Amino acid sequence: MAGRESDAVSLAGVVLAGGESRRMGRDKATLVLPGGSTTMVEHVLGIVGQRCEPVFVMAAQGQPLPPLQVPVLRDELRGLGPLPATGRGLRAAAEAGARFAFVCAVDMPGLTVDLIDDLVRSAIETDAEVVLPWDGRSHYLAAIYRTDLAERVDALVAAGERKMSALADSSDTQRIVMSDSAPLANVNTAADLPAPVRPGH
């Protein structure tokens, strides 16, 4: 698209790859997508990396991953969901000098750079702390977060919060209505996999 907003703002990427994948029955990050040899984590990194720099992968302790050209940070707290991993990713992004981070789940093969651009545009225009896509529900793991929210995440986790909604509810949050839900779709079973997968654009 003309005038990539992500070029005008310091935007890091945080890909959450350490989920337990109970319904899939196997690690989603290393799932090979139909029509090739690319794993889910490599596919999502290929999209996020077009708009975000640096990009961090949050993974579970001992979780096997293919060789990646980005930093991999291992979960310090196991079994607590995506909130503490998001906080650690935001802190790493802040330390790298980024003001915003696009945080997403690893199981989003339909993710597009256009979605990232739309969210970044809103973040710039509103200076909101959180910008979420909304298609009838809020998508917390395909959203823009200010990196200075890392301390707020720590406080929420220390208070016993586990849900990403707790961070959005305690922040200046903007929601963007999405007419196309395809880029937001998660893969929970093999039947959810698209075939073939097209690179996001």
Swiss-Prot record:
InterPro entries the record matches: MobA-like_NTP_Trfase, Molybde_CF_guanTrfase, Nucleotide-diphossugar_trans
Primary subcellular site in the record, as a coarse category: cytoplasm
Enzyme Commission numbers on file: 2.7.7.77
Superkingdom per UniProt: Bacteria
Entry-linked Pfam families: NTP_transf_3
Residues that hold GTP according to the record: L16, A17, G18, K28, D75, D107
Claim: Transferase is one of the keywords in the record: yes
Keywords attached to this entry: Cytoplasm, GTP-binding, Magnesium, Metal-binding, Molybdenum cofactor biosynthesis, Nucleotide-binding, Transferase
Subcellular localization(s) per the UniProt record: Cytoplasm
GO biological process: Mo-molybdopterin cofactor biosynthetic process
Catalytic activity as recorded in UniProt: Mo-molybdopterin + GTP + H(+) = Mo-molybdopterin guanine dinucleotide + diphosphate
Gene3D superfamilies: Spore Coat Polysaccharide Biosynthesis Protein SpsA, Chain A (3.90.550.10)
Cofactor(s) listed in the protein's UniProt record: Mg(2+)
Enzyme class: transferase
Chain positions recorded as Mg(2+) binding sites: D107
MF term (GO), any: molybdenum cofactor guanylyltransferase activity
Domain-level remarks: The N-terminal domain determines nucleotide recognition and specific binding, while the C-terminal domain determines the specific binding to the target protein.
Function: Transfers a GMP moiety from GTP to Mo-molybdopterin (Mo-MPT) cofactor (Moco or molybdenum cofactor) to form Mo-molybdopterin guanine dinucleotide (Mo-MGD) cofactor.
Name by which UniProt lists this protein: Probable molybdenum cofactor guanylyltransferase
Native species: Mycobacterium marinum (strain ATCC BAA-535 / M)
Gene that this sequence comes from: mobA
